[in-house]
Regions:
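Catalytic domains of carbohydrate-active enzymes that cleave complex glycans
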Residues: 556-722
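Feature activates predominantly on carbohydrate-active enzymes
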Residues: 134-137, 141, 180-372, 377-405, ...
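Aromatic-lined carbohydrate-recognition surfaces of secreted/lumenal glycan-active proteins
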Residues: 408-436, 496-505, 538-539
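Active-site neighborhood of glycoside hydrolase catalytic domains
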Residues: 387-427, 440-446, 452-456, 479, ...
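Acidic, contiguous N-terminal accessory segments
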Residues: 103-186, 230-239
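Cellulosome-associated attachment modules in secreted, modular CAZymes
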Residues: 4-104, 128
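Structured mid-domain segments that build the active-site/substrate or prosthetic-cofactor binding neighborhood
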Residues: 337-347, 358, 362, 469-586, ...
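Substrate-binding cleft/loops of secretory-pathway carbohydrate-active enzymes
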Residues: 428-457, 511-517, 545-552
Length: 722
């Protein structure tokens, strides 16, 4: 049994705080085995010794956990393990002789123990280089996992150990640099050295991939998990080269507010530029995507152009058509769009873009070649499109998407003239309208951000929603698929990129989360692997009461490695449930399956527009609420720490909030189970108070309610909103 000393962890956390800021994620450790207890009955005895011998003899029925029985940590059950086991039982030795204060008992690279290694960075490396940053991360996490203290040495001739983890900074303009690109890496194990090669981000990504092999799971903003294992080996002769398929990978939500950069965002290999505080951090290769404004920029640029411009980004008054607009009209989401065919409107937008770039430069920020972009995109509405004669005429053949993409094309041509010092700066334009334009095609330096707002109920390529009523875009998923394939083809023919904006979360009722976890793999696989998009934006978050952080984790894993199989994906899902919810994770997986089935497959719905009564099968919940609740309660009984208990109790609130809404008429109003209803209801309200949970978007602006009224549409997920 491992005996990790608290003081060592405190020291490790302090070191990280000094190196990377004031925050470090808490280490959550697996307690997966006890040395010698091969039958896992809680004691080490003669039966365990017998099981080891029986396993070696190939006897049927032998029970022998390899981690528990591999005393010498050679990766197998052997005669030496049997010998050591006998010695422990006789008192000549002790199982503590084969234990460690750390989660990884033995780490080998090229056949050599990790304690025989140092870390080598280029002689001229500084802390601003990605190779140096990666070396620091490797040093820190290997210390946590094994206790080894790896010295960072500058230049190979200055190495302090015979073997080394050697980081190499590769120039982007050399042959290997062109092969690896901005994010790829290559590594090999040769003559007992681990050699790592990368350009701007590759050294960092390789480090995190190797640390995952060691046993780390970077699953949370606030916690890092490590599995307990006897032996990890990176073998002599091993080599690998990897380049991420997607150029833009972003999972947006409330998961990066603590130490999210160092402990979650970068280890998850996300690179989206919406993490503003890290956009210019050269240690991590800066970030990819639009600077300053995520997507909807026309309202802001109009304000910058027509208001009183100063050296900072204070709010400016905005005038449109001679009228001063209200604040709600000139923010990032005004209820209007500029004219797409007016030279005057175009010049205002370009002036606003120019002034915004100037503002960014005056802050001391820089644009990174090939990966930096600026948004040049419609405001966040779908009703304010210009209806002048010229726009209406162009709309007939190009749709609203082609109408405004052509406006962005014009800006993309002019931006090269306006900023010749930024020859690779791209402009990003979001499209809501999925019309397939007849003639308009994007310029090479335009990024199309395709908002996939079809049906959130059915897998996007299932064909299951074709006959149902259309949603806000008058489109079902099959129409979205047709448009996405066409736009992807157009973009790639033009040498432009297309990114997909995916909406998996409903923000309307936080306690009745969208029951779509088990269909995400199908959507990811189709959108990325079959349609061939170049970037993926997964908008999640809100309140993490149900499975929202699980969705974020699954998305992060898949968009970095879209070649994973469904079996690999499912294993990642189950591992996460174990890490997040604890020993009762199998109960939660069964609950998750029932939660998926409880989502009705008979209708189409759209997150943030439809309400839970259209997303759930009320009849199924009425029949299965008690069983679903029992599963969560069973998992709660096995919780071993406060984080697991909080996660499970919040999940119970979601189960009760949705379930009690469904059975309200039968149990309470009709009197068939009033006592059970009141008991569950009271417990739910207590937990809502305990964790200060907010039931819905519409309610609890100023505090947590003491009671919920399921007959009030603002609190109930079942009553239809007029």
């Amino acid at each position: 049994m491992k005996k990790l000393l608290a003081i060592l962890l405190c020291c490790a956390m302090l070191c990280t705080s000094l190196a990377f800021g004031s925050y470090a994620a808490e280490l959550k450790e697996d307690d997966g085995y006890t040395v010698g207890d091969v039958d896992k009955d809680g004691t080490v005895n003669a039966i365990d010794s017998y099981n080891i011998k029986a396993t070696l003899a190939g006897a049927a029925g032998a029970v022998c956990d390899v981690e528990s029985g591999d005393l010498d940590a050679d990766g197998q059950i052997s005669a030496m393990d049997s010998y050591y086991m006998k010695a422990c039982l006789s008192g000549a030795m002790s199982t503590s002789d084969f234990e460690s204060d750390h989660n990884v008992y033995r780490l080998l690279i090229g056949g050599y123990d990790i304690n025989e290694f140092c870390i080598v960075v280029p002689e001229d490396a500084t802390r601003e280089d990605n190779a140096h940053y990666a070396a620091e991360r490797m040093q820190y996490y290997i210390g946590l996992a094994t206790g080894a203290e790896l010295e960072i040495c500058y230049g190979d001739e200055n190495r302090t150990k015979e073997h080394a983890i050697v980081y190499n900074m590769v120039a982007l303009d050399c042959e290997l640099g062109e092969e690896l690109g901005y994010e790829g890496y290559k590594y090999d194990v040769t003559d007992g050295d681990l050699n790592i090669y990368g350009t701007a981000r590759g050294n960092m990504y390789c480090t995190y991939d190797l640390l995952e092999r060691v046993g780390f799971v970077f699953y949370s903003d606030y916690y890092t998990f490590i599995w307990e294992t006897r032996r990890v080996e990176i073998c002599e002769g091993e080599s690998e080269s990897f380049v991420p398929e997607l150029s833009f990978r972003m999972v947006a939500g409330s998961y990066f507010g603590g130490g999210g950069c160092e402990d979650h965002f970068y280890p998850q290999k996300l690179n989206g530029s919406q993490l503003y505080r890290a956009e210019d951090d050269t240690r991590t290769g800066t970030l990819t995507g639009p600077r300053f404004i995520n997507a909807h920029s026309f309202g802001y640029y109009w304000r910058m152009a027509t208001g009183t411009y100063t050296d900072d980004d204070h709010l400016y008054e905005c005038w449109q058509s001679g009228e001063q607009k209200e604040e709600s009209d000139w923010g990032s989401s005004p209820p209007w769009q500029p004219c797409a065919t007016s030279d005057d409107d175009y010049e205002k937008l370009m002036l606003g873009l120019d002034r915004t770039i100037t503002m960014i430069e005056k802050r001391g920020q820089k644009f990174t070649p090939y990966i930096s972009a600026m948004s040049f995109s419609i405001a966040d509405n779908q009703k304010g499109y210009c209806s002048c004669r010229n726009c209406t005429k162009k709309y007939r053949t190009e749709g609203y998407s082609g109408l405004y993409i052509d406006l962005t094309n014009r800006a993309a041509r002019d931006i090269k003239k306006l900023y010749p010092e930024y020859p690779t700066l791209k402009l990003m334009s979001i499209i809501y309208d999925h019309s397939i334009p007849k003639t308009v095609r994007p310029e090479e330096n335009v990024i199309i951000f395709f908002c996939g707002q079809g049906c959130n109920n059915h897998p996007i390529n299932s064909g299951l929603c074709d006959g149902n009523k259309p949603l806000i875009h008058k489109l079902h998923n099959s129409a979205v698929v047709e448009s996405l394939k066409a736009w992807t083809e157009y973009c790639h023919e033009a040498g432009a990129e297309i990114w997909f904006w995916y909406y998996p979360t409903s923000f309307l009722f936080y306690m009745s989360p969208c029951p779509n976890v088990l269909k995400l793999y199908d959507d990811f696989d189709f959108i990325i692997n079959e349609c061939g998009v170049d970037g993926f934006y997964f908008e999640c978050g809100g309140r993490n009461y149900g499975f929202e952080s699980l969705k974020a984790h699954l998305a992060s894993e898949f968009i970095y490695d879209p070649d994973m199989t469904r079996e690999e994906y499912t294993q990642i899902l189950k591992d996460y449930l174990y890490i997040y919810y604890g020993a009762g994770y199998e109960y939660i997986y069964e609950y998750l399956e029932m939660h998926h089935v409880s989502g009705t497959m008979d209708t189409c719905y759209l997150n943030n527009f439809n309400y839970p009564q259209e997303m759930y099968d009320e009849e199924y919940l009425c029949a299965n609420y008690e069983k679903m609740r029992e599963l969560v309660v069973s998992a709660i009984a096995l919780a071993k720490d406060a984080s697991e208990l909080e996660a499970l109790e919040k999940l119970l609130v979601c189960c009760d909030f949705t379930g009690l809404s469904a059975v309200h008429t039968d149990w309470y109003k009709n009197g068939n189970n009033v006592d059970g209803y009141v008991a569950n209801y009271d417990e739910m309200c207590e937990l809502i108070q305990k964790y200060e949970m907010r039931p819905s978007t519409f309610q609890n602006e100023d505090g947590t309610p003491e009671q919920l009224d399921f007959t009030d549409y603002e609190n109930s997920p079942w009553d239809q909103v007029a």
